[in-house]
């Protein structure tokens, strides 16, 4: 059965979705899930080959998708990507702001250049993307925004000081959008994963283990039980983006198998 026929009455049928950082990992899994549920999907990412691969996967399954290469730390490139998406699919009413990265390094060894780069990719990009999105969603009847934060927004982790800062910042961005734009019909929530089986997540675990921590086996068992799969995060994002979550606003959704609750 094609993706189109399966998703004729899908949970996101009739919606137009933009995903930043949608070329790989959680972003790719969510792009595929959005399309499977009936959304038209625009992917914004700096990774060109991987972005087109994701679009190809969606189209081969019968969905509709476009890729727009963009450095999401630059407002002019973001604007070009949004303009291209609107030209292709019309006004969007779902945004999954997922683009991000990580640095694993002791605070005393973290350079100003490290700080600027990580905050630009994780925080400035979210500010620029959401600034454009709330304006257009307000003009077009509202929509749903989901921002990828992390349990690192709430819990402090050694060797990830700037990463934790950045994820706390975007969690607060989600919360403030939810209050400021609620009456414009915009919902905004954050998804907060633990460790996820992506290139990003596995690199993080390897770097932490190399620094003397024990996340790969014992640490994982003690905190979240096992590693999370990107499709499990995507399922949470689909719910938050859908009309099923019509009264869910300003929420931090932990996809961590109880890690944050356990503390």
Language model feature labels by segment:
Residues 108, 155-161, 183-184, 225, ...:
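Active-site loop immediately N-terminal to the catalytic Tyr-X3-Lys motif
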Residues 2-8, 155, 238, 249-263:
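Short C-terminal tail/terminal secondary-structure segment
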Residues 135, 179-183, 246:
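Alpha-helical segment proximal to the catalytic Tyr-Lys
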Residues 106-107, 114-117, 218:
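Substrate-binding pocket helix/loop in short-chain dehydrogenase/reductase
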Residues 222-233, 244:
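A conserved structural motif in NAD(P)-dependent oxidoreductases
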Residues 130, 166, 174:
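Active-site helix of classical SDR
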Residues 150:
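Residue(s) in the substrate-gating loop at a strand-loop-helix junction
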């Amino acid at each position: 059965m094609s993706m189109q026929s399966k998703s004729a009455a899908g949970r996101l049928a009739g919606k137009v979705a933009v995903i930043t950082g949608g070329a790989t990992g959680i972003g790719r899994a969510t792009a595929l899930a959005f399309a499977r549920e009936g959304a038209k999907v625009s992917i914004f990412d700096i990774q060109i080959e991987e972005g087109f691969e994701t679009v190809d996967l969606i189209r081969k399954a019968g969905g509709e998708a476009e890729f727009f290469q963009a450095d999401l730390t630059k407002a002019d490139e973001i604007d070009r990507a949004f303009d291209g998406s609107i030209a292709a699919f019309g006004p969007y009413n779902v945004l999954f702001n997922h683009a991000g990265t990580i640095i694993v390094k002791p605070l005393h060894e973290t350079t100003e250049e490290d700080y600027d780069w990580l905050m630009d990719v994780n925080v400035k990009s979210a500010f620029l993307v959401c600034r454009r999105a709330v304006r257009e969603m307000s003009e077009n009847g509202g929509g749903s925004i989901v921002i990828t934060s992390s349990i690192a927004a709430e819990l402090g982790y050694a060797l990830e000081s700037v990463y934790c800062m950045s994820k706390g910042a975007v969690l607060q961005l989600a919360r403030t959008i939810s209050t400021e734009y609620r009456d414009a019909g915009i919902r905004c929530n954050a998804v907060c994963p633990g460790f996820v089986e992506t290139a990003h997540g596995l690199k993080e675990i390897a770097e932490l283990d190399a620094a003397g921590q024990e996340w790969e086996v014992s640490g994982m068992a003690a905190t979240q039980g096992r590693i999370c799969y990107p499709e499990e995060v995507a399922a949470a994002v689909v719910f938050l983006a859908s009309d099923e979550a019509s009264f869910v606003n300003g929420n931090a959704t932990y996809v961590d198998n109880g890690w944050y609750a356990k503390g």
